[in-house]
């Protein structure tokens, strides 16, 4: 219910009320009524004070006076007259304060209105209208010293409003005459603002920002921003753009060093010219908006931006923006451009432009950058970028490629092929880098795959290694899988667009799904982890289906930091979605908390794990190899809280009254290696955490009340567990009877804990 006022840097003052926007510059006042999001375009009214005459005297008016802002009032000081606009939520009150010293006779004020709307009289004054809506210009009044309002003759002559003040009112004005008409929307559209293409990014300590495209008309889209707390409460809002420039497909990212957000969008500053515009802002108690600027002022057209930020605290960090690029006048065919922006909003360096030698009609399209570039040292810090190669032909195959983007651009490094087979690959999304130690520098690429001729669309995922602090590792694809089974999607349904991010440990995937029986759409959200170099479902996954006829457009992991300032996994994700109903389009948002710490694997003969060494297969999934007591194989599970440091491990289905050792490894070996009568999937540095004797029921738990926690025990053994690290646990135990196997010990299935 408040009027928004902005000075975006175009030498005009802008205001937006509940049903109008207006701009004020040296060219005069421009009023743009809201006729509904489905209006084909804007229908503005441009007001220009043309003349004021008193008797035979014409007042000298300064037609180039600048607009001045004071609270909710805009004033033009035009010599002997002040032209004023008082801004209210549903109307604008125009007034003219005229110095009448020495004037006599009737006074005539002429105001030219440049508009496509048709003007006509009604009982209230003048109405400008078309089939989409109407704007009223009320009969003007003179405000007398007593406060009484004297109606004035207000007429329309062609495109000129004429307001006549009788001579006696001029004489009685005591040197100052106030003429006061009101501009407002006299018939509201039946629908409100439609919202499209929301995006989300995270700042620090759980705060997050949404940006969304607001449709003012079919040729004028605005961009709004909202700041939400960790508790899902809207803290503040900001209007990133509500000028008459068309802004579409907004993206948002955060720079921790400057503590500024950057929003970018595909904009059209002039007819037929598309550029990527950006604007920085802060959203604290003393929020600030910085001037709008073009990231791509060069020749050619620029479309479909994607944006990455940097959550590292040191100086010199940047944002990265990549967009589609079409330059028909350039000597070579260019298809993509990258721009780097400093934390304070300056373009850094030349960026990069890709002008590949592609077959005629083929283009790189739909780029997708990761939200952040990880926590590696700056020399080995990368954003992940996925993009499609399209032939431009309908129903043709598309291929999906990947590059890593360091500061300054990718240089001559060759791209990776993520999916180069037959079929249609689209809607790619790239997570922020995840992992620690040897597992660091990994990103998840999620995308939609549709068979060329028949079959349901599905979501696929690729785990890509883009580097780590200890090496200059070349990029490599570690694993590719259909994500349906990992995230719990329904195979018989159609999966559509997906989006992904990482909190530095695991990944989250949000996707749209269409029920093939009812044609209803919904959104699924789930977490995915890694076991070694393989993608795996995350234990304790949270799945959320919120609403129908929606598609996810953005997901962002909430950033969390330890007392020392080091990042720690938050297990919290912010999801933005576009919602469509029978009448309008809007947005939905959700905050997902993914509580799963445990991932279960290493059941021999299932998944990636090799079969048992001597035909002693487990009786069911989640068991280790069968033992001589024929329990079906030992199983291991986890429980407790990371926050309370109360994680405990419980083994069951072991041999009764047997010696058992709780084992920790810092590397997962998904295939397993033969270990006694079973398969060991815990690798790397192995620690014996505890020795136990199983119960008569073949059970054992570690730790129990009074014992050090697993984290404290590992630290005492010289192997501290950093936040975000993964450790693998198994229990091996005495199994001396033969049962067809030569060894005298066996081992449970494995549980991976995300610390």
Q: Where are the predicted features?
A:
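Hydrophobic residues positioned within well-ordered beta-strands of beta-sheet architectures
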Residues: 74, 94, 107-111, 152, ...
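Residues that cap or anchor secondary-structure elements
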Residues: 1-184
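Extracellular, repeat-based ectodomains that mediate carbohydrate processing or recognition
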Residues: 1-7, 11-14, 18-24, 182-595
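Extracellular and analogous surface-interaction loops
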Residues: 96-103, 202-203, 434-437, 639-642, ...
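Residue-level hotspots within well-ordered secondary structure
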Residues: 595-755
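Short, surface-exposed loop/turn segments at beta-strand-coil junctions that are enriched for proline
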Residues: 101, 169-170, 312, 713-722
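Short coil-to-beta strand junction motifs in C2/discoidin
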Residues: 120-124, 397, 459, 657, ...
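Short beta-strand/loop motifs in extracellular/secreted proteins, especially
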Residues: 107, 117, 138, 221, ...
């Amino acid at each position: 219910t408040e009027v928004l006022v902005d000075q975006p840097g175009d030498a005009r003052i802008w205001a937006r009320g509940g049903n109008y926007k207006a701009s004020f510059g040296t060219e005069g006042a421009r009023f743009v009524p809201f006729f509904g999001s489905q209006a084909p375009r804007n229908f503005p009214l441009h007001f220009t004070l043309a003349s004021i005459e008193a008797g035979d005297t014409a007042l000298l008016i300064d037609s180039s006076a600048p607009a001045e802002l004071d609270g909710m009032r805009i004033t033009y000081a035009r010599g002997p007259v002040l032209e004023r606009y008082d801004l209210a939520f549903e109307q604008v009150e125009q007034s003219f304060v005229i110095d009448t010293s020495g004037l006599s006779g009737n006074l005539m004020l002429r105001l030219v209105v440049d508009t496509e709307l048709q003007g006509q009289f009604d009982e209230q004054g003048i109405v400008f209208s078309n089939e989409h809506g109407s704007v009223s210009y009320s009969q003007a009044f003179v405000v007398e010293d007593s406060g009484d309002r004297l109606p004035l003759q207000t007429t329309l002559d062609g495109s000129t409003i004429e307001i006549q003040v009788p001579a006696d009112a001029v004489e009685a004005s005591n040197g100052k005459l106030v003429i006061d008409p009101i501009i407002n929307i006299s018939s509201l559209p039946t629908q409100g603002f439609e919202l499209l293409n929301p995006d989300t990014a995270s700042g620090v300590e759980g705060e997050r920002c949404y940006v969304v495209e607001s449709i003012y008309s079919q040729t004028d889209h605005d961009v709004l921003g909202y700041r939400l707390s960790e508790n899902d409460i809207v803290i503040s809002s900001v209007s990133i753009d509500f000028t008459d420039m068309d802004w579409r497909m907004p993206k948002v990212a955060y720079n921790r060093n400057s503590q500024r957000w950057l929003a970018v969008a595909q904009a059209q500053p002039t007819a037929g010219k598309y550029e990527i515009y950006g604007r920085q802002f802060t959203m604290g108690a003393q929020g600030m908006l910085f001037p709008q600027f073009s990231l791509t002022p060069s020749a050619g057209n620029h479309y479909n931006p994607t944006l990455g930020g940097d959550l590292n605290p040191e100086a010199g960090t940047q944002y990265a923006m990549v967009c589609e690029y079409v330059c028909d006048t350039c000597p070579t065919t260019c298809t993509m451009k990258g721009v780097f922006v400093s934390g304070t909003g300056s373009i850094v360096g030349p960026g990069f432009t890709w002008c590949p030698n592609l077959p005629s009609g083929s283009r790189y399209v739909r780029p997708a950058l990761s939200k952040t570039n990880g926590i590696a040292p700056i020399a080995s810090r990368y954003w992940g970028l996925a993009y499609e190669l399209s032939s431009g032909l309908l129903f043709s195959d598309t291929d999906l490629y990947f590059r890593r983007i360091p500061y300054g651009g990718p240089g001559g490094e060759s791209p990776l092929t993520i999916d180069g087979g037959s079929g249609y690959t689209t809607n790619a999304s790239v997570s922020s880098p995840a992992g620690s130690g040897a597992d660091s520098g990994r990103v998840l690429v999620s995308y939609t795959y549709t068979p060329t001729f028949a079959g349901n669309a599905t979501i696929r995922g690729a785990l890509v290694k883009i580097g780590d602090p200890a090496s200059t590792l070349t990029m490599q694809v570690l694993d590719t899988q259909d994500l349906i089974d990992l995230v719990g999607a329904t195979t018989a349904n159609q999966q559509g667009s997906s989006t992904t991010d990482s909190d530095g440990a695991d990944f989250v995937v949000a996707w749209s799904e269409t029920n093939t029986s009812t044609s209803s759409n919904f959104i699924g959200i789930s977490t995915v982890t890694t076991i070694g170099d393989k993608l795996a479902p995350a234990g304790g996954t949270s799945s959320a289906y919120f609403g129908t006829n929606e598609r996810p457009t953005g997901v962002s992991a909430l950033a969390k930091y330890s007392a020392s300032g080091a990042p720690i996994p938050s297990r919290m994700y912010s999801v933005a979605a576009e919602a469509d109903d029978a009448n309008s389009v809007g947005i939905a948002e959700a905050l997902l908390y993914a509580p799963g710490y445990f991932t279960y694997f290493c059941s021999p003969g299932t998944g990636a794990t090799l079969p048992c060494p001597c035909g002693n297969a487990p009786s069911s999934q989640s068991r280790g190899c069968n033992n001589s007591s024929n329990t079906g194989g030992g199983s291991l599970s986890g429980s407790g809280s990371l926050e309370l440091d109360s994680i405990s491990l419980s083994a069951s289905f072991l041999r009764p009254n047997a010696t058992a050792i709780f084992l920790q490894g810092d590397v997962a070996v998904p295939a397993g290696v033969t270990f006694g009568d079973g398969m060991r999937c815990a690798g790397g540095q192995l620690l014996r955490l505890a020795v136990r004797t199983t119960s008569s029921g073949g059970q054992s738990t570690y730790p129990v009340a009074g014992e050090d926690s697993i984290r404290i025990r590992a630290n005492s053994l010289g192997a501290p567990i950093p936040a975000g690290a993964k450790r693998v646990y198994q229990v091996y135990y005495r199994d001396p009877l033969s049962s067809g196997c030569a060894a005298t010990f066996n081992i449970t299935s494995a549980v991976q804990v995300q610390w």
